[in-house]
C-alpha cells in the first residue's frame, strides 16, 4: 500500500494514464502501427492547452501552437520513393466525431500546417498534414530530384490522406464515416488536384484562393517584375506611391456596388482611369505619378499574355495592389518565381532573372511537371461519386488573382455543359469581398476558414461546419457569411458573400454594415 502510494506520487502521469482510456490508447498506439512505407517518429498524448513540441520539426517551420483539445499526436516519415519522403503528422482528438480531414500547404510547401490541424481537431476531426515532401518554402530541393518535385506537384496530399485514414481506422474502433479536405493557396491547388486526380479521396473539399493555374502564376511574377521595372529605374514606383494608386483605385471603384465602405465588391466591374493621378504641375511627386509611371501601372494591372497571344494569367485584383507592392513590385523578381525557373524550368543554379523572356514562360507551361497545373475542368468523376467542392477567393488577394478562380468555374461549366444551377449541386464558388490572401483584408473576411478567422461569438461562421452540413445533411450554402472583426476581436459587422456568378449590390435601406441591405444579383 505504501509502495503504491509512493509510486502514485512519483508517477502522476502514469497513474492518470492508467485511469484514462484515451491516454492509455495513445500511449500504446505506436505498437499497433504497421503501415507500409511509414516510419513512426513519435506518438504522444497532448493535453488541451499544452504547447506542441517542435523538436523534430524543421527549423524553418517552427511555430508556437497550443493544442485546442486533448489529442494523440503521431509524427512520421512516409516514403514515396527511394529518393523522397514526406514528414507527416496525424492529430487524433479525444472529442472525435467520426470525421477525417486532410490539410494542405502554402507557398512552395515545406511545412506541415499545424494551425490547420489544430483548427480541425478542435471540432473533432481526425486530421493529417504533410510538409509536401521537403523542408521550407523553397524550390531548391527540386534541383535534380524529380521525385521530390512529384511529391510537391500532386503526390504528398494523396499519400498523406491514405496513411491518415489508415491511422484513423487503427486508433478509433468506429473508423471514420466521412472524409474532408481543407486548404488554401497552394493548399487550394492541392484540393483541386485531389478533385481532378483522386476523386474518391474525399466527400467534401474546401479549396481557397487556389494557385491552380500554378505555372502561369509563377510566370506572372516575372511579368509583373518586367512591367514595373528595376528599383533604380527613373520611373520606378515606390511602395508609398502604390499606396496612393490604391487609394485612387478604391476612390473610383468603391461606389460601383452602391456602398461607400472602402471595399470593391467585385473587381470585374471596376475600370479605374490611372491617368487621373498624373501630376498637373501643381502637385508633388508624393501624391501623383508621371505619365510613364501611369503606363507601368496599366501594364501591371493588365492580363498577362503568352508569346502566342493567349492569356496566360488574368490581371491583378483591383484593390490588392498596395499589398502586392512588397511582393511583386520591389524592383526584383519575386523570389518564388526566380527559384522555380532556376531549380525546375532550367535546372541550373547559374540561371538568373535577367534571362527571363516570354519564351521562358512558354517553356515552363510546356513542361508542366507531373501536371502540376490543377486546371483540368473535367471533374465529372468527383461529381458522379457525390463529392462536394466549396471554393472561395478574396477579391483583395494581392498574390493570386481571384479572376483565375472565376475562369476555372467557367471552364468547368463549359466542359460539363452545365448551367450554374446544375453546378450548384456539387460545386459552389464564393467571392469574398475585402479578403486578402486566404484571410485578412479590409472587409468581412473572417469566414471560419481556420484559426484566426473563426470566433466563438459567431459559431455558425465556420467553413468546416458549412461543408459538413452540405455533405451530411444536404444543406448547401446559399451565401457565405463573413465577419469583419475589430482589433479586440469583437464583430464590427457581418456580410453575406454571394455565390458566383452572382455578385453583391448594396440596395438598402440599411447602411453597408447591415447584412440584409445587400442583394446578390
Swiss-Prot record:
It is found in: Secreted. InterPro entries: AB_hydrolase_fold, Tannase/feruloyl_esterase. Ca(2+) binds at residues 254, 257, 259, 261, 263. The keyword Disulfide bond applies. Gene3D superfamilies: alpha/beta hydrolase. It catalyses: feruloyl-polysaccharide + H2O = ferulate + polysaccharide. Disulfide bonds join 26-72, 61-111, 184-438, 253-270, 279-288, 498-520. Pfam families: Tannase. Glycosylated. Inhibited by the specific serine esterase inhibitor AEBSF. Its EC number is 3.1.1.73. The active site is at residues 185, 397, 437. Its main location: secreted. Transmembrane segments: none annotated. Homodimer. Involved in degradation of plant cell walls. Hydrolyzes of the feruloyl-arabinose ester bond in arabinoxylans as well as the feruloyl-galactose and feruloyl-arabinose ester bonds in pectin. This is Feruloyl esterase B. It comes from Aspergillus niger.
Amino acid at each position: 500500500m505504501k509502495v503504491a502510494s509512493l509510486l502514485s506520487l512519483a508517477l502522476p502521469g502514469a497513474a492518470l494514464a492508467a485511469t484514462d482510456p484515451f491516454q492509455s490508447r495513445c500511449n500504446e498506439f505506436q505498437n499497433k502501427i504497421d503501415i507500409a512505407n511509414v516510419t513512426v517518429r513519435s506518438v504522444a498524448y497532448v493535453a488541451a492547452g499544452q504547447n506542441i513540441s517542435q523538436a523534430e520539426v524543421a527549423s524553418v517551420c517552427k511555430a508556437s501552437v497550443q493544442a485546442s483539445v486533448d489529442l494523440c499526436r503521431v509524427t512520421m516519415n512516409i516514403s514515396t520513393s527511394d529518393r523522397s519522403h514526406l514528414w507527416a503528422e496525424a492529430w487524433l482528438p479525444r472529442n472525435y466525431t467520426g470525421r477525417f480531414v486532410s490539410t494542405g500547404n502554402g507557398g512552395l510547401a515545406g511545412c506541415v500546417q499545424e494551425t490547420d490541424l489544430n483548427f480541425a481537431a478542435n471540432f473533432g476531426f481526425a486530421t493529417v498534414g504533410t510538409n509536401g515532401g521537403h523542408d521550407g518554402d523553397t524550390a531548391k530541393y527540386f534541383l535534380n530530384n524529380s521525385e521530390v518535385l512529384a511529391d510537391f506537384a500532386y503526390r504528398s496530399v494523396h499519400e498523406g490522406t491514405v496513411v491518415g485514414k489508415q491511422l484513423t481506422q487503427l486508433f478509433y474502433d468506429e473508423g471514420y464515416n466521412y472524409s474532408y479536405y481543407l486548404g488554401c493557396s497552394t493548399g487550394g491547388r492541392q484540393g483541386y488536384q485531389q478533385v481532378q486526380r483522386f476523386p474518391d479521396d474525399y466527400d467534401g473539399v474546401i479549396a481557397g484562393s487556389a494557385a491552380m493555374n500554378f505555372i502561369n502564376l509563377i510566370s506572372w511574377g516575372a511579368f509583373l517584375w518586367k512591367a514595373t521595372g528595376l528599383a533604380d529605374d527613373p520611373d520606378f514606383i515606390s511602395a508609398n506611391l502604390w499606396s496612393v494608386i490604391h487609394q485612387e483605385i478604391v476612390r473610383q471603384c468603391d461606389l460601383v456596388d452602391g456602398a461607400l465602405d472602402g471595399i470593391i465588391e467585385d473587381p470585374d466591374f471596376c475600370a479605374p482611369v490611372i491617368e487621373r493621378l498624373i501630376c498637373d504641375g501643381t502637385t508633388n511627386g508624393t501624391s501623383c505619378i508621371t505619365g510613364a509611371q501611369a503606363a507601368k501601372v496599366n501594364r501591371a494591372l493588365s492580363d498577362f499574355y503568352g508569346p502566342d497571344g493567349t492569356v496566360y494569367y488574368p490581371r491583378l485584383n483591383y484593390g490588392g495592389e498596395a499589398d502586392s507592392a512588397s511582393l511583386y513590385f520591389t524592383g526584383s523578381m519575386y523570389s518564388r518565381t526566380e527559384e522555380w525557373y532556376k531549380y525546375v524550368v532550367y535546372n541550373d543554379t547559374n540561371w538568373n532573372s535577367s534571362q527571363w523572356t516570354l519564351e521562358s514562360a512558354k517553356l515552363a507551361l510546356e513542361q508542366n511537371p507531373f501536371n502540376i497545373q490543377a486546371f483540368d475542368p473535367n471533374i465529372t468523376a468527383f461529381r458522379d461519386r457525390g463529392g462536394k467542392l466549396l471554393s472561395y477567393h478574396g477579391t483583395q488577394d494581392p498574390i493570386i488573382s481571384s479572376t483565375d478562380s472565376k475562369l476555372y468555374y467557367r471552364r468547368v461549366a463549359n466542359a460539363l455543359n452545365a448551367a450554374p444551377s446544375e453546378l450548384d449541386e456539387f460545386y459552389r464558388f464564393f467571392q469574398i469581398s475585402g479578403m486578402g490572401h486566404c484571410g485578412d483584408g479590409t472587409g468581412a473576411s473572417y469566414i471560419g476558414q481556420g484559426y484566426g478567422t473563426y470566433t466563438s461569438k459567431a459559431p455558425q461562421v465556420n467553413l468546416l461546419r458549412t461543408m459538413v452540413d452540405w455533405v451530411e445533411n444536404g444543406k448547401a450554402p446559399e451565401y457565405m457569411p463573413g465577419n469583419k472583426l475589430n482589433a479586440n476581436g469583437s464583430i464590427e459587422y457581418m456580410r453575406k458573400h454571394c455565390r458566383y456568378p452572382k455578385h453583391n449590390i448594396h440596395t438598402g435601406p440599411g447602411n453597408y454594415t447591415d447584412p440584409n441591405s445587400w442583394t446578390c444579383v
